[in-house]
Amino acid sequence: LKLVLISTLAVFTSGAGLFSSKNNDIATDKSIKSTKPWANIEGFRSAKFGMRMDEVKKSITRDFAIAGGKIDAISHPTEQTQSLGISVDNLLPNSGKSRVVYVFGYKSKRLMQVNILTGQPVDMDIKPQQVVDAGNLLGNHFFKKRYQEDGLVAHARLSDGSVLIFRGKDQKGRMALLRLSNPQPNAKKGDDLKITLTLSYI
């Protein structure tokens, strides 16, 4: 995908013009590379990469006080992977409902990826600016750590118009990826834009 660097975090150039960040303390690419300490991407909260499904269920209960009956078991029809899914309210301040999916390896049966979705269609009532604010908050969190220069991306627009807020790998090659979906390209002021923030730990 062709990447075109953009100067501000999570800015959509749609007709609505709603999505400019108010945060003036955005880190630059140079500061991301030199900032210490190194990032350590181990999983999500107490659920760590390499855990078995039963261990992740215990982590979910510990992290979110969600009982086993409210944890969804998901099977991918083509990749044949198994996942656990939960819904969480206000995972970030004023961010509405989020969907957290823990993905396990087909052969290893161990946790290998965590995907977190905020915004549409997880929460049909959330305001677009709430989703953008959540992206800004997460982006600035990632920018405080140091990552490998290889593959490091910040503030980039993808060819489909979506915004890659951040992509970076720790010293072990584990990745965090934060992406804000493209709103409707022909949206006008006042339109009900449907955008999604996706955070993946891989």
What are these regions (language model features)?
Residues 59-95:
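Short N-terminal edge-element motif at the start of the domain
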Residues 4-12:
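Bacterial N-terminal signal peptides
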Residues 17-72, 113-202:
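Non-cytosolic coordination micro-motifs
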Residues 100-105:
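Hydrophobic/aromatic beta-strand elements that line small-molecule binding cavities or substrate pockets
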Residues 94-97, 171-173:
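Glycine-centered tight beta-turn/hairpin loop motif at sheet-sheet or coil-to-beta transitions
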Residues 92-96, 122-125:
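Short, cysteine-centered beta-strand-loop-beta hairpins and adjacent loop/turn segments enriched
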